[in-house]
Amino acid sequence: MLTTAINGGIVVDVIRGTRHRRNLGIENGRIVEISETPLEAQEVIWADGLTVAPGFIDVHGHVDGNDYAGILSAYQGITTTVGGNCGCSPSSIGDFFRNQESLGFPVNQAMLIGHETALREEAGALDRYKPATEEQIQTMTQLARKALQEGACGISFGLDYVPGSSLDEVIALAQVCKEYDKICPVHTRLLTDKDMYSLYELFQVARKTGVHILISHFVYQYCNGLVEEGLRMVEKAMKENLDIQLDSGMYTNWTTYFNTATFDLQNIQNSHWRWDQMIVATGEHTGSVMTEELYYHMKEKHPCEAIICFERKEQEVYDCLVKPYVMPSTDIGAYAEGEGHPQIAGTYPRYFRKMVREKKLLTLEEAVYKATLLPARVFGFDQKGSIEKGKDADLTIFDPATIRDRSDYPHRGKPDAKPDGIPYVLVNGCLTVCNGEYTGRRCGRIIRK
């Protein structure tokens, strides 16, 4: 008898762009049967009236082994998360993988090796305002090769956070990534709030190396009136056969840590941000609006907290995510309960609510494809992203009519409020979310590339 059956649901075929009532049989963590008649199994999930989709793949997160972030990911239908983004990762990918395999995890994890916290720091290039030396670059390339051989799915960059990093060191590492046929996700370098050189820099890297580049959280980088121009530049580069794709969050208001170069006073002034555009997202001042006095207090006493910056150009989110080469992503971080940005619990429910149900910018099939098979193909996750016999049984079962985000900003509500409309999530065939509640099962696997 089958281990698990999902009967009566409307199954999304992301390969053909269709959906049909089908019944799924699962055994040993994989889909083994797709039937037009209901199936018997040890565990039967009745999904009448619900959509059965491949599990969502979050290409830009910072879960990195944090349990609560993993649980929040599962609540919003994510079954695979890519960590180590923005140049920030564990220094040893091999050690991280072994540790996570011994502990288990709520969702699957793939990891990037980070330019700043792993490669630069291990090579001794500790000053983020200075370029690495030739010797340090050579050390970084050796460390990168080791990480890629251990299964990292690429090299991530957070050029905003390391303003001193040279084009030479980025190109050297991108060449290593290309050697292994892996991807470079890049949080672009913004010198001002109107900086488009950041994109030209990436195009230059792509031309010189041929590496596959993923521009991280595109709207968060350019949502101050530059998205239209930025997309035009990207599409022109794609016509030159540069291998470029984008991911984007569902919010106009982004967050990062206070101790990064982003919140240097000079950068705040260059970006023309007002104090009242910044909200403290973590720690004892959670929900407080930034003031000059609070800024200096936190610089001295609380430099490691997260800050949300409000920019408010919502239409640019939709203009970006409607593009066929853009994937949704969360930028989820590892926060304590009740803290953080609403993206940690609301990104994918908000994506389906806004893009499909309310604004009708995407069909349901298109939206599911962009959250599943497209990222699986971009990262080469061959066993993920579609509902086919033999594929891993990563499945998200939701109601398109009721799916919605309930999370809010910390000065208004709960950033980690669970969404509505996602009753079941299976990770490698294990029922990880049942009736909207986490079951405690830790069936996520490490994805080595």
Q: Model-derived features: where do they sit?
A:
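N-terminal metal-binding scaffold of metallo-dependent hydrolase/deaminase domains
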Residues: 1-40, 367, 403-407
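Divalent metal-coordination and catalytic microenvironments
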Residues: 9, 24, 29, 49, ...
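Structural signature of the urease/amidohydrolase superfamily beta/alpha-barrel
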Residues: 29, 376, 382-407
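Divalent-metal coordination cores built from histidine and acidic residues
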Residues: 52, 69-156, 242
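Histidine-centered catalytic micro-motifs
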Residues: 55-65, 159, 184-190
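Active-site neighborhoods of metal-dependent hydrolases
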Residues: 125-126, 130, 134, 140-157, ...
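C-terminal cap of metal-dependent C-N hydrolases
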Residues: 318-325, 330-331, 396-445
